[in-house]
């Protein structure tokens, strides 16, 4: 198959639409459904991310994409009991690749509603069973077990999008893109991200444990496929907050940091103790938790309202309790796709438990950024490599 006709492009008025190869066969097979234009943008970007993440870490990897940026990405380390609870995966059998996807989707479950999933490894029944429970547009993987494919084909009334990609496919070294009838040409960003990038530690504190190195690689590879400007917070093998497509660096850091704070707060005892009414849908639980953690908590706790969601009216999680809980957190890594121009990014990041930073460096104020890290004992590595993605 050299081309695949699509229903329309980004919007219904954008016709005709297709994906095609000028030379050779498309490296994919559509095993189920009818993926659209944006689905394929998500699929091909997310596949590159998980493929490179597995190559860099040696672990199964997964991503959850929305509108051509990752809402989350992760490697397949086992889940704790608390993580199983906040990801609605209690009592489920979870293979390493299933753990990777559960973590990737769990980074920001609200943003992952209707996501495109990407798996570095063959999709097995464990992963398919979890996907079947979630609202998702489709999945790309290098293969599917018979049982997994049968499960996925029952999703969305049989219309769930399932794409298989040739894991050995390698694109051309030069890529093209048309904008306003004008063709842009550039070398593909084939820069390999690995531990050698982390050797230039510029702070007084140079203690970088293996777990932090892994998390730095996850941050950098996630950023490589996130619309710029972008910042990514990572902890324990998974993204916990991705700030994408912002026009100032500090807004990226704040956006991603606020998402990371929400991830941390979902593990607060008051959140873990929320008692939901029987039969509540997973998206409704996600929405309720998100509102409960926000300043608009009365929208779900008001008299006559809370009964729709909770069996018992929850106690308010106060601003003081939130601040105290987040202040106790540590071991978080943050990555940036371009240099931090000011120390304010470090000041914001450390409020979310950040102890490790990886970024290109190259600002005229690098000395100030380094000094801010030194003030808090943060370890920072300069990679010398910008990772813009558009």
Predicted regions and their residues:
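Active-site loops and adjacent core secondary-structure elements that bind or stabilize anionic groups
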Residues: 1-197, 212-230
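Flexible, glycine/charged-enriched surface loops at secondary-structure junctions
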Residues: 56-64, 162-165, 228-235, 265-276, ...
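Active-site-proximal loop/turn and secondary-structure-junction residues that shape catalytic pockets
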Residues: 69, 123, 235-238, 340, ...
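C-terminal accessory/binding modules appended to enzymatic or scaffolding proteins
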Residues: 197, 209-210, 214, 218, ...
């Amino acid at each position: 198959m050299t081309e695949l006709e699509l229903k329309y492009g980004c919007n219904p008025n954008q016709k005709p639409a297709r994906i095609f190869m000028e030379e050779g066969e498309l490296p994919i097979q559509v095993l189920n459904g009818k993926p659209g234009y944006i689905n394929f943008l998500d699929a091909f970007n997310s596949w590159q991310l998980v493929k490179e993440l597995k190559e860099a870490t040696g672990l199964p990897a997964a991503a959850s994409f929305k509108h051509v940026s990752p809402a989350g990405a992760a490697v397949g380390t086992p889940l704790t009991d608390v993580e199983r609870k906040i990801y609605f995966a209690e009592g489920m059998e979870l293979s390493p690749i299933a753990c990777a996807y559960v973590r990737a989707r769990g980074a920001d479950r609200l943003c992952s509603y209707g996501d495109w999933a990407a798996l570095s490894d063959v999709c097995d029944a464990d992963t398919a069973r979890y996907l079947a429970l979630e609202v998702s547009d489709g999945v790309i993987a290098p293969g599917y077990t018979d049982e997994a494919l049968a499960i996925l084909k029952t999703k969305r009334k049989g219309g769930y999008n399932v794409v298989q990609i040739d894991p050995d496919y390698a694109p051309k070294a030069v890529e093209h893109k048309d904008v306003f009838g004008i063709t842009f040409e550039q070398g593909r960003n084939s820069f390999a991200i690995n531990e050698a990038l982390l050797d230039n530690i510029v702070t007084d504190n140079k203690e970088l444990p293996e777990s932090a190195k892994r998390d730095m690689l996850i941050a950098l590879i996630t950023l490589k496929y996130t619309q710029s400007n972008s910042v990514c917070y990572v902890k324990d093998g998974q993204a916990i907050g991705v700030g994408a497509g912002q026009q100032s660096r500090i807004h990226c850091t704040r956006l991603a940091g606020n998402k990371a704070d929400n991830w941390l707060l979902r593990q607060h005892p008051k959140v873990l103790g929320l008692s939901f009414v029987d039969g509540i849908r997973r998206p409704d639980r996600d929405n309720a938790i998100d509102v409960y953690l926000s300043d608009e908590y009365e929208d779900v706790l008001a008299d006559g309202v809370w009964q729709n969601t909770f069996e018992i009216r929850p106690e308010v999680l106060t601003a003081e309790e939130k601040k105290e809980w987040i202040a106790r957190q540590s071991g978080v890594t943050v990555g940036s796709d371009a240099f931090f121009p000011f120390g304010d990014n470090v000041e914001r990041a450390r409020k979310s438990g950040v102890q490790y930073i990886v970024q290109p460096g190259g600002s005229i104020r690098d000395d100030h950024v380094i000094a801010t890290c030194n003030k808090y004992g943060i370890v920072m590595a300069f990679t010398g490599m910008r990772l813009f993605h558009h």
